[in-house]
Structures are given as C-alpha cells and as structure tokens.
Amino acid sequence: MITEGFLARHHMGRSGMKGPALLDVAQDYVLKHLFEEGIFDLGVVLKGGTSLRKFRAGNAGRFSTDLDFAAPDATTAELLLDTLDEATIEGVTFRLINRTPLRATLLIETPLGRPDIPAKIEVSPRRLWLAPEMLIPIALPVHGGYEFEMPRLPAPAIEEALAEKLAAWRRRRKIRDLYDLYWFGQGVLDETLVRRILMLKVWHDVVDDGLGIAPFDPLEVVADFDVAKLPPEDIGLLTQPVEPARWLTAVRHRYMFVTQLDADETTIAHCSPGDRWPVQQLLNSL
C-alpha cells in the first residue's frame, strides 16, 4: 500500500480530502484484483463516473465514490461480487455488506485506515452496446507508490458513456452528472452516435425498467433548470471551482444536437413496447 506521503500528495493536503483520496487509491486495488482474477476477460467493463475519471480525466476529473460495472449476464455479475468479497491484495482488504444479487456496499481496510466516506458497487447484467476500448488508466503520481503497474482494462466508448450520462440526467438531476457532461463534452464527439444511443437507452429505461414516462422529449435533456434545486452532494470536495450554473449553460449548448431526431429516432421517442423489433434492429446496427 502507498505511504502517507503519497496519499497526502494525491489530495494535495486539502482539508477533508484524505477519505476520498484513499478511496480513489483503493479502487485501483479493486481493479487490479479483478484483473488478476480474470473477471475482465469475461466481458466485464468498468463504467460510470469512476471509469471517466480513471481513463479519461485523471486528476483533472472528480473523485467518484462508486464502482459501476457492466457484465454480460447476472451470473457474471454475481461472480464479480463473489470475487471481491473478503479478498485481500497487498494489504488492502475488501468486504461487501448490504448485498443484493447486483449491488452492495463496499467496505475497505487499508494499512492507512478505512475511507471515511461510503462506497457502493453495482453491476448491470447487460453488455454495453459499443465495443469497449482497452485503456491504461491515466498515469498519476500516486501510482508510483503502488506495488504493481495499472493494467490495461476495458472502458466504454466515450459516446456510449456520455449517452448513458445524458439518460441519467433525464432520470435525475445530480450535480455529478452535470459536471461529467460538462467536462467530457468539451472534445470532439460523434454526435449522431451519441444521440442514437441516448434514444435507445431512454427507450429501455422507460419500457423495460419503468424509469420515466412516455413519450420522451429530448428537449428535457437540454432544458433550463434552477441549479439551486440540485440535491447536495460532496462535489465541493471533488473539484474546484464549483460552478453549476456555468456548467449547465455549457451543457445545454453542447448537447443541443440530441433534439435533432431523424425518422427512426422520432419513432423510438414514443417509448412504445410495440417498437421492440425496430429498436432491436437499430441496436444491431450500432
């Protein structure tokens, strides 16, 4: 395990940041253990905010307290949790509590103590739709204190990651989703692909998972919003400065392309169970 000096360097001595920084480091030990146990060879992919930080932003991104994975099926999802529960790597021990078949609370013990913030792990029993990219996490100074090198791991294509974030922003208004959309939308994107995947994800959210009502108007995603109503989160510990009003303005402008639906996407927007066959055909064409 890293030394206190490496950890202090990681959180730059900022008050209240030791817990998030220790959790961020412990997540790397989780990934290394799962890699060594062959879990990623089974089609598992790290997704969500932690994936974006590890593979796309490094120290420029926010700390993400949760680990979200995509797995090809529920059996693999449960195997992932079984593999992690009561595991130890280089003096770091993991234990799962409040466990259900696909999610749990993650408890971590390290030689430097236990992170003082809650961490969750969740596994979706559905494959990603686009082929993942094999990436090595962005090199950080703290990695110099590890007993191992970070392995190359599967990460979602940026277009699918952002489409999933847009779908999440539709379902809930969380400042972490707003920040991720702002930060990762600054580069060049295949806008047509992002929009197509967003429409398909929302269709599945509404029809299969009961998350939201039909029809879906993509203007919801880029609508104005009173940022004062965003639920409180620890975003202030994770990134500076915290400017949700500026982020929202940028997000509304950057993602306006999601409203420019073609004929197929206009059909999908109805979120009708009767459209399952054409939806599947569009998925197959991705």
What are these regions (language model features)?
Residues 1-44, 55-67, 71-286:
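Structured mid-to-C-terminal alpha-helical surface segments
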Residues 46-51:
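Glycine-rich beta-strand-to-loop/alpha-helix junction loops that act as flexible
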